[in-house]
C-alpha cells in the first residue's frame, strides 16, 4: 500500500496482528462489557486498523472517532491513529485533516510531519493517476468520434 515508509509506524500499520493477538484484544473488550475502558477500545481500534479487511479498518476508524469525541485526554493519540486509519482506507481528505489538527497541537511532532508528507504524496499520486485515466478516456472518446466522422463521410 505504501512505498518505502517515511517512518516505522507506516510499515507497522501494514502488518496485521496475528489471530491470537487480535483475539486477545477482542477478549479484553468483551470482558469489560458493557462499558469497556477507553484504552481497551483504543487498543481494539488499533488492531482493527492494522487488519487487511477494509470493513474492519473502517470500524476501527469509527471507534477512534467516537473516542475523539468522548475522551479529551486521548485526543493527541486518537488524532494520530485516526489519520493513519483514514490513510489506510483511502480517505485522504480526513487523514490530512486529522494530522493537521494534531500539528496544531504539536507543531514540532516529526511523526505527524512525516505522516502529512506521506498523505500529500498519496493525494498527488492519486490525482495524477486520475488525470491520466481521464486523459486516456478522452483520447479514446475522441478517437471513436473521429472514426465515426470518417466513416460517415464515405
UniProtKB/Swiss-Prot annotation:
Entry keyword Mitochondrion: yes
One GO CC term on file: mitochondrial outer membrane
Top-level lineage group: Eukaryota
Main location: mitochondrion
Mapped TPR repeat ranges: 76-109
Disulfide bond annotation, renumbered to this chain: none
Chain ranges on the Mitochondrial intermembrane side, renumbered to this chain: 150-154
CDD domains reported in the protein's UniProt record: Fis1
Keywords: Membrane, Mitochondrion, Mitochondrion outer membrane, Repeat, TPR repeat, Transmembrane, Transmembrane helix
Family to which this protein belongs: Belongs to the FIS1 family.
Matches recorded under PANTHER family: MITOCHONDRIAL FISSION 1 PROTEIN, TETRATRICOPEPTIDE REPEAT PROTEIN 11 TPR REPEAT PROTEIN 11
Domain remarks: The C-terminus is required for mitochondrial localization, while the N-terminus is necessary for mitochondrial fission.
Name assigned to this protein: Mitochondrial fission 1 protein
Organism lineage string: Eukaryota, Fungi, Dikarya, Ascomycota, Saccharomycotina
Encoding gene, per UniProt annotation: FIS1
Amino acid at each position: 500500500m505504501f512505498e518505502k515508509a517515511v517512518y516505522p509506524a507506516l510499515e507497522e500499520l501494514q502488518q496485521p496482528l496475528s489471530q491470537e493477538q487480535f483475539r486477545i484484544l477482542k477478549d479484553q473488550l468483551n470482558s469489560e462489557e458493557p462499558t469497556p475502558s477507553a484504552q481497551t477500545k483504543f487498543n481494539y481500534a488499533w488492531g482493527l486498523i492494522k487488519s487487511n479487511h477494509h470493513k474492519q479498518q473502517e470500524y476501527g476508524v469509527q471507534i477512534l472517532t467516537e473516542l475523539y469525541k468522548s475522551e479529551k485526554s486521548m485526543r493527541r493519540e486518537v488524532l494520530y491513529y485516526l489519520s493513519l486509519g483514514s490513510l489506510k482506507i483511502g480517505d485522504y481528505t480526513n487523514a490530512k485533516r486529522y494530522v493537521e489538527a494534531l500539528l496544531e497541537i504539536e507543531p514540532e511532532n516529526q511523526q505527524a510531519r512525516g505522516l502529512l508528507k506521506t498523505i500529500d504524496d498519496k493525494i498527488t499520486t492519486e490525482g495524477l493517476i486520475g488525470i491520466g485515466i481521464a486523459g486516456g478516456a478522452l483520447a479514446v472518446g475522441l478517437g471513436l468520434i473521429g472514426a465515426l466522422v470518417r466513416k460517415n463521410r464515405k
